[in-house]
Amino acid sequence: MTEQPAQPKMTARSLAVHYGGKPALKGVDLDIVAGEVNALIGPSGCGKSTFLRCLNRMNDTIPAAKVSGQATLDGEDIYGPAGMDPVLLRARVGMVFQRPNPFPKSIYDNVAFGPRLHGLVAEGDEMDVLVRTSLERAGLWKEVKDVLGNLGTSLSGGQQQRLCIARAIAVSPEVILMDEPCSALDPIATARIEELIDELRDVFTIVMVTHSMQQAARVSQTTAFFHLGEIVEVGATEQIFTAPANSLTQGYITGRFG
């Protein structure tokens, strides 16, 4: 029986971004594979974070940004003429940022914020279960179950990042975007987040920007290499790191530039 290729959860076609007339992304085509960790690598300023922000329209918040081309979620154009409500889109495509950014609220209220905003469950027992389940999925429940009323900002850096992941998954997104989620963390906290990412891909499609070649090789199944606003090469992570087809990719992963 022939194995069917993995279907894309999201796609980009001729996706371009200009900031005040300056090109940051130049007509990118890319499929985001469902049920995988899709890593985006490349030197600083190559467009990978700009691309990531296109996937849930975070670039809409930047006045000078102009986006053209197409990006789809399950075949629906998120920039189409009818438009997709950015708030609803961001519930389906969550985001975890480079530095942990818990709200100045309790641990409980950080996780409950999204479900309350979208009216997903009732307060009380239903919300309690959702908060607990989200914290368990983020590998944080046992560490905070007795201090849920404490401020999220009172946690360690690694715990704060896991709290932000719990907050993202509390609204049951289909895709989680991660913009260098470990860059501000120590090696122990980084290892825990990487383990968590591997667990989460059983439920969510993940797109992750990382500057760490080792991290991309460890946690992703598909890797796209960006350079100067374009995609140079995309493929299975093992192939990208062991037998890249493009000499520019080879130069980057071996440290000759970047």
Swiss-Prot record:
Concerning SUPFAM superfamilies, the annotation shows:
P-loop containing nucleoside triphosphate hydrolases
Q: What does this protein do?
A: Part of the ABC transporter complex PstSACB involved in phosphate import. Responsible for energy coupling to the transport system.
| A Gene Ontology cellular-component term | plasma membrane
In this chain the ABC transporter domain maps to 10-253
The membrane topology noted for this protein in its Swiss-Prot or TrEMBL record is: Peripheral membrane protein
As for subcellular location, the record says: Cell inner membrane
Give the PANTHER family listed for this entry: ABC TRANSPORTER I FAMILY MEMBER 17 (PTHR43423:SF1)
The reaction(s) annotated as catalysed by this protein in its Swiss-Prot or TrEMBL entry are: phosphate(out) + ATP + H2O = ADP + 2 phosphate(in) + H(+)
Provide the binding site for ATP: G42, P43, S44, G45, C46, G47, K48, S49
Sorted alphabetically, the keyword list is:
ATP-binding, Cell inner membrane, Cell membrane, Membrane, Nucleotide-binding, Phosphate transport, Translocase, Transport
The biological process GO terms on file are: phosphate ion transmembrane transport
- Quote the gene name from the UniProt entry: pstB3
Name any one GO molecular function.
ATPase-coupled phosphate ion transmembrane transporter activity
| Protein family membership | Belongs to the ABC transporter superfamily. Phosphate importer (TC 3.A.1.7) family.
User: Its Enzyme Commission number?
Assistant: 7.3.2.1
Q: Which positions are tagged coiled coil?
A: none
Which Pfam families does the entry mention? Answer: ABC_tran (PF00005)
What name goes with this protein? Phosphate import ATP-binding protein PstB 3
- Origin species, per record, is Paramagnetospirillum magneticum (strain ATCC 700264 / AMB-1) (Magnetospirillum magneticum)
Q: How does it assemble?
A: The complex is composed of two ATP-binding proteins (PstB), two transmembrane proteins (PstC and PstA) and a solute-binding protein (PstS).
What EC class does the entry list? translocase
